[in-house]
């Protein structure tokens, strides 16, 4: 049997076992949506890290660094710094005021139906963007490993089915433990791969960085080029490159605090103190991991080479090909299985956040106006919606094809989260005057601005030469109207402006009256949701 397939099957068997165990403990909404709020701080911290260290991190960032050096490393810096926003601003108030979703915080003192409807739409949009990136990575990875045994489309469908199984049967508890197992494996594999890279250079940083400054590759004209990968400019070139880099940084740093699948993790712990504790655990793991992406990306550039990577799966396969070059096919299979585990864990987290938002926010509190529903209906709706969300993600990933860089796709999801979700969360918690009109306007403007600018950016809009065919061609064959690849530098301020203007042109005395209650609860935890009894 193909050793890669064997390792895949072993991991799938382990995770299905976890799902079966969790399914026996996921009775009731609190157990299904929030794991009974009984996850310990260190467990949730590892799970948060597992949720955050996605295919974009392991496959995408390594690939961008391998091809674009210093500019690619800026992705690592942005994702690393981002958790300071979560720790200092979001984690404690969110845990104290919410129940299952981001919209719970907004609905605490605002009119629930309009804010939940818009927040649910935003959650589904961000989750779908993020999920598509993971599915693209999964399809490309499995196709590379198993060769002619499966097609890219079949690989994407298989991952989608597994994702749906985890969520439908295991809920948040299964998702949490799949993420913990995956995070431990990913850290172990990344540490080992980093050590092997440095061993290749005799543990000499001088040799390592010397090799990086002399990376050789062929450009689009077929000319061999030697470039210093430690210098900026390979990706972000003048005149708009510096602005694009700032825009990327804004999206990554502020987007994390608006990612639905990260925010819902803080509802799985008993209290706000444990939520803060879990963020510290996550930051230690995430910080270590993103430092090591330097070794993975630059190691792939110097040891494997951009030309070889381009001809064997593209940028997303840089880390697995590095493992193969350093330690042969068995280690290649092991690292690829870890990458596969990474994808499965993250898509499960994304799906549970999307289905929870649809079921709890839209179905129960918008369609049925918060009326008491029969026991188990909310969970049943979430399980059914998992099939719909999974099907949409599978379809779009198949249309995009295996060549899209997953780190870049995820960066766009961060831009949408930072533009739509973060402004309304921050203003709801910290601004007394903030009201329902401001929340709805902020969410709508943030969503429309970020998605609209993405559609008319060079990411999707460009005139390709006739030699570029298939999925490599841009979606819209015209000159881009917006010069930056990432819209964050414009769409994030627009999200805040929309929320502020919407608030100032309307009045809602009840929202202001409930602000003191929200302030006390968000800072003290009085009245916060308690852990479920078992």
Task: Identify what each model region corresponds to.
Residues 1-534:
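Membrane-embedded helix-loop-helix hairpins and adjacent transmembrane boundary segments
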